């Protein structure tokens, strides 16, 4: 299954609690909570390029499944991690005590990030 495409955020759960837990300033949390960001994914075999645009903020991450990479987080911090592919529709990684699972089902992509007992879920639809 190919992840390639553009996806627009449809809904999210626990945005504010998760962003507070990772240390994002309140001002940025309030600015970001209603932005319907767009994610563009380009997949070439096991190589992925993610471009996430939320308002004026753009995050670009590139990685190859199973190889160590450096990813930029929502706070702008760069972390080293390894992204794994589970089945043919689920990307999984862990960094800084956060487990991130990105799952593709048809035209819907669900990103679930878990930090302790806080589960932040973003649901986006292919556009």
Swiss-Prot record:
Signal peptide extent: none
Protein's GO biological process: cellular detoxification; cellular response to hydrogen peroxide; cellular response to hypoxia; fatty acid transport
N-acetylmethionine modification, residue list: 1
Record's protein name: Fatty acid-binding protein, liver
Keywords from the UniProt entry: Acetylation, Cytoplasm, Lipid-binding, Phosphoprotein, Transport
Residues recorded as bearing Phosphoserine in the entry: 11, 39, 56, 100
Family of this protein: Belongs to the calycin superfamily. Fatty-acid binding protein (FABP) family.
Cross-referenced SUPFAM superfamilies: Lipocalins
Subcellular location: Cytoplasm
GO cellular component, one term: cytosol
Biological function: Plays a role in lipoprotein-mediated cholesterol uptake in hepatocytes. Binds cholesterol. Binds free fatty acids and their coenzyme A derivatives, bilirubin, and some other small molecules in the cytoplasm. May be involved in intracellular lipid transport.
InterPro entries: Calycin, Fatty_acid-bd, ILBP
The encoding gene: FABP1
GO function term, MF aspect, one: chromatin binding
PANTHER family per UniProt: FATTY ACID BINDING PROTEIN
Organism from which the protein derives: Homo sapiens
Primary site of residence: cytoplasm
Result of altering residue 94 to A: Increases the binding for cholesterol; increases high density lipoprotein (HDL)- and low density lipoprotein (LDL)-mediated cholesterol uptake
Positions carrying N6-succinyllysine: 31, 36, 46, 57, 78, 90, 121
Acetylation keyword on record: yes
Domain of life, source organism: Eukaryota
Domain notes: Forms a beta-barrel structure that accommodates hydrophobic ligands in its interior.
Keyword RNA-binding: no
Modified residues (Phosphothreonine): 51
